[in-house]
Amino acid sequence: MPLPEPSEQEGESVKASQEPSPKPGTEVIPAAPRKPRKFSKLVLLTASKDSTKVAGAKRKGVHCVMSLGVPGPATLAKALLQTHPEAQRAIEAAPQEPEQKRSRQDPGTDRTEDSGLAAGPPEAAGENFAPCSVAPGKSL
């Protein structure tokens, strides 16, 4: 009976002395769950036209109230007028400009509306207006 070659015996002895290795990917240690971060100041995004909801957000210390939809000037005015009287003039003046441009382009509009708009320039036409001008340290 032929004897196996010494190299084969060494290979078998090494294989026999080794512990069976686990399959790759079976020794996965699960990571500890992380706690979500808490943010001290969040911006409230609302699409509501209800001024009571805006006032409620104001009481909670929200610095800026924004809308997700396409709000009219009156909706934005309700959110800002209670605290910023200077902003009120800018918001009230802003809707007049698009109406003037539209009335000049569309000759079929009512002339009584044009005469009321063309009486004078808007009060805050030259002012720059930022809808969220509250400093971070102050609440509405």
Curated annotation (Swiss-Prot):
Pfam families in UniProt: FLYWCH_N (PF15423)
Residues covered by region (Disordered): 1-39, 84-140
Leader sequence segment: none
Residue ranges, compositional bias (Low complexity): 118-127
Residue ranges, compositional bias (Basic and acidic residues): 98-114
Alphabetical list of InterPro entries matching this protein: FLYWCH_N (IPR029279), FWCH1/FWCH2 (IPR040312)
Modified sites of kind Phosphoserine: 21
GO molecular function: RNA binding
Keyword GTP-binding annotated: no
Keywords: Phosphoprotein
Protein name: FLYWCH family member 2
Annotated organism of origin: Homo sapiens (Human)
